[in-house]
Amino acid sequence: MTKRILVAVDGSEEAVNAARFAASEWPDAEITLLHVINPADSTTGAEGGFPGAVDQWYENARNRGERLLSEAAAAVDADVDTRLELGRPTATILDVANGDVDDDADPFDHVVLASQGRTGLSRVVLGSVAEGVVRRADMPVTVVR
């Protein structure tokens, strides 16, 4: 029986649909929505090389992540937990899923994520995140289209 579900959320409607799917498929499970802030994104903005820019970028990314999680949680017809982490998306999703981030955390039973939540280059990146999670996860993974 699936008890703990981790759903990766990137702000796309597809990711929100993945969260809705998880809530409807496993109504009695503990669902956690996870958004990963990718530090590699900090060097892609126009302000990338200025002093203090990384701190400002991180604050903006954290605020955006909290907003995305709040919006996704509100869109799901279930009680869900939210979690915000900093790291490379694939590795961080897997670490959280395996319970490797917190010393006292149990592993999740299942991971749910969207196949491709964005367009253009970010679509390729998200697709590679989904593929990486599917290939390396120690637990079942559901990819929602």
Locations of regions flagged by a protein language model:
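Gly/Ser-rich helix-loop-strand patches that form or flank binding pockets
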Residues: 103-104, 110-145
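Structural beta-alpha unit
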Residues: 74-111, 136-139
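Acidic, proline/glycine-rich short linear motifs
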Residues: 37-64
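Active-site phosphate/pyrophosphate- and oxyanion-stabilizing loops and adjacent acidic/basic residues
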Residues: 20, 70, 131
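Small/aliphatic-rich secondary-structure junction motif
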Residues: 3-47
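N-terminal membrane-insertion helices
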Residues: 65-69
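Terminal disorder- and signal-encoded targeting elements
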Residues: 1-6, 16, 50, 125, ...
